[in-house]
Structure formats: structure tokens, C-alpha cells
Amino acid sequence: TPVGDLDKVFEAYRDLYSGPQREDSPETGVDMSMGYLYRLVAGCLIAGDLQKVEQGYVFCGEPLTNERPYFAGYLRIPDIPKFMDKLEAISDEWGYLLLWATLFLSVVFGLVLMLLPMIFGWQAFFQRHRGKPGVIVYFLCLGVGYIFVEIAMISKYILCLGNATVSVAILVTGMLLFSGLGSYLSARFVPAARRTIIVVCSSITLLLLFYASYLDRILGMVGLWPYGAKIVFCLLLLFPLALLMGFPFAIGMSTLSRLRKEHFFVWAWGINGSFSVVGSVLVPIISVSLGISTVIVMAAIIYLTALPSFFNLQLPDS
């Protein structure tokens, strides 16, 4: 059958590119000419078997969508090790491979910077205070979650605003302005920090899940509006989420101060900043493979994870 022949051709291509004996045995015994491959693929497409072609081809041949708008994103993650000694075959993907290298370096340096205070001179201090796991997880989640939302929303806003530069300017300006306002307002809620964090993190999670499901439709509805109106609408759409996202970091730092754990300040800032860098590298890696909305869903899960870690952070010293 054409499908069976196509499986053999795809397998031969994989052996040629990544098989253990590809250099010694270039002959596969299978007709690998472009004409034959074209006829087999065309036959499968006419028969409605697109999934067979997508799954069997050497590279990812799925059509581009607004969720995964990456023209050069044709390399599957499990296949990356197979191409390490044949990089000329995937020259368009070198930037993607550099992302993985950057991720490795950022995680390593982030962990080193996070552990340095515990190694040099602060052992006694860390032994005296409770809530250390909460400090680590809480501020790590805030760093990764915030940058996940920021970068994913930039990609979403491009659909409405039609320009990457404008999207970045509007999104970053709105996030910083509204989050700053949220941080300022959070001072009033520090005495009820536990209840406030429950409400804030739960609300952020629900908003992110809503945006992941419906943001594309909402932005599509305003696509024909005047450009100024679209900018105002995008800012208004961002306002409730960004305002709430300004609360957790400020309340976390204020809680440390109320518990007389000011020595954790530098550590918390460092963890938050280091893993913001890690998150900024993770976003394109995840969105290439799983889609931009998946990044927003992951951000929702991360903010929900920050909730129990805040309870541990609140533990008073014995």
C-alpha cells in the first residue's frame, strides 16, 4: 500500500540522517527519489491520511498556526541528539539549539547563585530560620510565572496590533505600570497577607486560564477597530491581570520584613531575578513545541503553586 511504502521511505530517511551506520551504508535499498516521495505523500494526502505524513516525516511538517507561528520550527525535541554531529542539515534551527544551551547555562548559574549564600558564611543564619523552602519556591514561581505571562501576552497581542514592536511597547508598559500600582496597593493588605495571597493567586490563575481559552477570540473581535482604540482595549484587557500580579512579590517581601527575616531579602531578589531569565528562555522552547496558550496555562499552574509555598514562607522562627 502507499502508506506502507511511505513508512519505508521515512524510515530510510531517518537511517540516512541519524542511523548508526549512515556513513558506511548510504544505500538503503529503498527508492528515496524526490519524485517517488512526492507521489507517496500526495497519495496519502488525497486519501485523507495527513496524520501519517506528519508523524512519519523526518522533520515536523505540521502546518503553521497562530499558536505555533514558527517557520523554522521543524525539529522535534526527541530528535535533537541525533543531529548533534550533523548540524549542517538543520542550519535553520541553530538559533533553537542555542536556546537549549542558554537554558542549561541559565539554570546552572541560577542554582549556583541561589546556593552560594548557603555555602559561604551563612550556614548559621540559614539554620536559625524556618521557611527557607517557601522562600525558594515562592520567589522562583513569581519570577518564572511573571515572565511567562509577559512574553506569551506579547505574542498574543501581535495578532491584534499587527506589529511586534508596538506589541512589546504596549505590553511591557502596561505590565510595569499596572503591576507597580498593584505593588503600591498591596501595602494595605499586608496585615491580612494569608487571605490576600489566596484571593490574588486564585484570581490570577482563573484569569490566565480564561485568557488561554478565549484571548484569541477576544482580540480577533477588535481586529477592525481603529488602531488607537485597539491599543486602549489591549491595555484595559491587561489591567486586572497585571494589577493582581503586582501583589505577590510585594506582599512576600513585606511578610519577610514583618517576620524579621530581612536577611532573606537579597536571596529572594536573586532567586526571582535568576529564574526570570530561565523563564524567558523556556517560553520560546515551550511555545515552539506546545503552543503559546500552553505557556499561559503553565503560568497559571505556577501561580497556583506559589500559594502553598507562601504558607511555608510565613512560618515564624522557633
Where are the model-predicted features located?
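Alpha-helical transmembrane segments of multi-pass membrane proteins
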Residues: 1-318
